[in-house]
A protein has these predicted regions:
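Bacterial N-terminal signal peptides that target proteins for export
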Residues: 1-12
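Exported/periplasmic cell-wall-interacting domains
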Residues: 31, 37-40, 60, 65, ...
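C-terminal segment of classical bacterial N-terminal signal peptides
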Residues: 17-26
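Residue-level detector of beta-strand structural context in well-folded domains
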Residues: 43-45, 52, 121
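Structural recognition of beta-strand segments within beta-rich domains
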Residues: 46-48, 55-56, 152
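Beta-strand-connecting loop/turn residues
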Residues: 50-52, 129
Length: 175
């Protein structure tokens, strides 16, 4: 039995390191890129859902580009909205359509809980309060067509964006 424990302990360490590496986002989760579309002023957030990218326009022909998870088939949308609220480790109540699809979810998941899909921070969007730009508890979904209309970011990326924007920041969602 002692032999088995000695063997399992190193195995557990190896598996733990593999799982930690695979659960971590890529090192270049965000980058600064050329952004020459003069339609948007500095400080604007532009989300291009077909690219699954969010751009924070810096001006001077550059933007910070972040990967995002976007609305799945039938849930994608486009339009102009604003950041309506900013929250660190927010609690989450599943909207009616999520609750319908996943009735086992509790009515409220506390902020900071590993089960909370909002992740490290959320910025709610105007237009009814049903959509947000937020972190995630499942980093592997960033970059996919996966949400009910919200925009999922790696937690370190949503915190970076959070620090750059304020309530009232313009958000333009395009396909």
């Amino acid at each position: 039995m002692a032999y088995r424990v000695q063997w399992l302990t190193p195995l557990a360490a190896v598996l733990s390191s593999i799982l930690t590496i695979s659960a971590s986002p890529p090192a270049a989760a965000r980058d600064i890129v050329a952004f020459r579309d003069g339609s948007y002023s500095a400080g604007t957030i532009v989300i291009r859902t077909n690219e699954r990218r969010l751009y924070y326009v810096m001006g001077d022909g550059r933007a910070v580009r972040y990967p995002v998870g976007v609305g799945k088939a039938g849930k994608a949308w486009n339009g102009r909205v604003q950041i309506e609220g900013k929250y660190i480790r927010p609690a989450w109540s599943p909207p009616a359509d999520v609750k319908r699809d996943k009735p086992q979810l509790p009515n409220l998941i506390a902020g900071g809980s590993p089960r909370n899909p909002m992740g490290a921070a959320a910025m709610t969007l105007s237009g009814g309060g049903q959509y947000a730009i937020h972190g995630t508890n499942v980093p592997g979904t960033v970059g996919g067509f996966v949400s009910y209309g919200c925009f999922r970011m790696y937690n370190q990326d949503v915190l970076d964006l959070y620090s750059r924007v304020s309530v009232g920041t313009a958000v333009v969602v395009t396909r």
